[in-house]
Regions:
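Extended, low-polarity transmembrane helix blocks
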Residues: 1-44, 62-70, 74-154
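Short juxtamembrane and helix-loop transition motifs at transmembrane-helix boundaries
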Residues: 46-58, 86
Length: 154
């Protein structure tokens, strides 16, 4: 029994210790790529996206459309680089909350429906990245190591 449990639990645990960098990297690359291009598309089609924001009842659409588009583009870029990861993931998470409330909330009739939205899945991933951080394979990692070696500010 011990051998079976070691094979089913212990061995995968030992292997995964060497791959802790892969989860955050894969998550950052996946959503970073999606939002880099989503933001780019919105930035290059602001009039149409602004009309969509008006139709969804989002206040100040002429301000929030370029702001949201920029958050998506630069947030995606920063996630790809692993730079300012927690801030970028937090900003993109807030964007997903607004997207759900503004464009999808009327379609929610159950928890299953809410959890099935792409925006909710992105929100979960952004929350994880904001809490867990970018991982070792990121630009944030050497900056964090450098900051740790600096004397405390007066």
């Amino acid at each position: 029994m011990r051998l079976l449990l070691d094979w089913l639990i212990g061995w995968p645990e030992r292997v995964s210790r060497h791959l802790t960098w892969l989860g955050p990297l894969f998550a950052r690359f996946t959503v970073g790529w999606v939002f880099l291009w989503s933001g780019w598309g919105k930035l290059n089609n602001l009039p149409q996206v602004t009309e969509n924001f008006v139709g969804w009842g989002i206040p100040f659409p002429h301000v929030l459309t370029p702001l949201t588009s920029g958050i998506e583009f630069f947030g995606g870029l920063f996630l790809l680089l692993g730079l300012l990861t927690r801030i970028s993931a937090g900003a993109l998470g807030v964007t997903m909350i607004v997207a759900i409330k503004a464009a999808k909330w009327g379609d929610v009739d159950s928890l299953e429906t809410l959890l099935g939205f792409d925006e909710f899945e992105y929100l979960a991933l952004f929350l994880w990245l904001a809490i867990a951080g970018p991982g070792r394979v990121s630009l944030d990692a050497p900056i964090s190591r450098w900051l740790a070696r600096q004397p405390p500010s007066p």
